[in-house]
Amino acid sequence: MAQRQPHSPNQTLISITNDTESSSVVSNDNTNKGRSGDNSPGIEALCAIYITYAVIISVGILGNAILIKVFFKTKSMQTVPNIFITSLAFGDLLLLLTCVPVDATHYLAEGWLFGRIGCKVLSFIRLTSVGVSVFTLTILSADRYKAVVKPLERQPSNAILKTCIKAGCVWIVSMIFALPEAIFSNVYSFRDPNKNVTFESCTSYPVSKKLLQEIHSLLCFLVFYIIPLSIISVYYSLIARTLYKSTLNIPTEEQGHARKQIESRKRIARTVLVLVALFALCWLPNHLLYLYHSFTSQTYVDPSAMHFIFTIFSRVLAFSNSCVNPFALYWLSKTFQKHFKAQLFCCKAEQPEPPVADTSLTTLAVMGRVPGTGNMQMSEISVTSFPGCSVKQAEDRV
């Protein structure tokens, strides 16, 4: 009797942009077409995998949908950083609704189920979503740097419109980067001479072309990981330096107000930094595994249990990045936490009245010309200021 081959998600290569990692056995010279291996995952392992995928999909859809709803239904949350964060949520939803369920089918079905068109469309969506995530975080870091360096700069009246255009440009750039993936992706078959087995996979290059594998994996690692995170690191180094200097140069008479302002800027910058760290942590194992397969002689399936576990771990961790952002915001932002609870339990968020103690009476000197005399006269008027009436609007609220 012929030996059956292991059915695993990495029968060929691991890729963040295509389904070479999801290729399945098409035929064996000594067995029926489409049969998988005796050492395939047991029923317990498959149940654990599917439960994990189901949790990622359901929790991710719920969290991102509530985040988007909070943004559109709450006027005070429609700020510059929140526009980028909402765009991030749309990208995550796209991945959760398409690519994650498709990836889950690879553990149950044998062979690529979605045809040549499905291969191209899903490869395009996957890379677009990854691009939206990392490029949005990059431009959001640049925005936070500008907010820290020029905290008192009044935003133009069309700041929201400009930010929406920037977010749209991120999507366009991501689609442009993903377009070659859609053009060249196809369902390829290749043969493992060691086990006399033919594999089928959705990939952006013929799997037998070793040089193309290496170029593809290296470009993905550079464009969608190393370069954006390097730019973000530069911005956050400058943010840290600016905040440190501003802390040292606070005048004594303005210390209370200035420290509150610095704390607010630090809180928003910290929120963005957490989102960046989550992206870097979640996607690193998948990138490393893809590079390992591309630059080593390990072209075909590695039957070891450790390799299978690490493959599952890297994929689950990468997909988990699409569901953790709303909960990171819930943990970091009391404002978002309040609105998140209100939307989750279908109740109205409380809008606290400003305390009387926060109002202040200010005396202003006004000089004007006395009618009929032509003489200048100075008068004093009293102005009561209330919270929220400062020159700088709440455009940085998260």
From Swiss-Prot:
The chain crosses the membrane at residues 41-62, 82-102, 121-142, 163-183, 220-240, 272-292, 313-332. It is a multi-pass membrane protein. InterPro entries: Bombesin_rcpt_3 (IPR001560), Bombsn_rcpt-like (IPR001556), GPCR_Rhodpsn (IPR000276), GPCR_Rhodpsn_7TM (IPR017452). One of its GO terms (biological process) is G protein-coupled receptor signaling pathway. It comes from Macaca mulatta (Rhesus macaque). This is Bombesin receptor subtype-3. A lipid is attached at residue 346 (S-palmitoyl cysteine). It is found in: Cell membrane. Gene3D superfamilies: Rhodopsin 7-helix transmembrane proteins. Belongs to the G-protein coupled receptor 1 family. The keyword DNA-binding does not apply. Keywords: Cell membrane, Disulfide bond, G-protein coupled receptor, Glycoprotein, Lipoprotein, Membrane, Palmitate, Receptor, Transducer, Transmembrane, Transmembrane helix. GO terms for molecular function: bombesin receptor activity; neuropeptide receptor activity. Residues 63-81, 143-162, 241-271, 333-398 are cytoplasmic. Disulfide bonds join 119-202. Interacts with C6orf89. CDD domains: 7tmA_BRS-3. Residues 1-40, 103-120, 184-219, 293-312 are extracellular. Glycans are attached at residues 10, 18. One of its GO terms (cellular component) is plasma membrane. It comes from the Eukaryota. Role in sperm cell division, maturation, or function. This receptor mediates its action by association with G proteins that activate a phosphatidylinositol-calcium second messenger system.
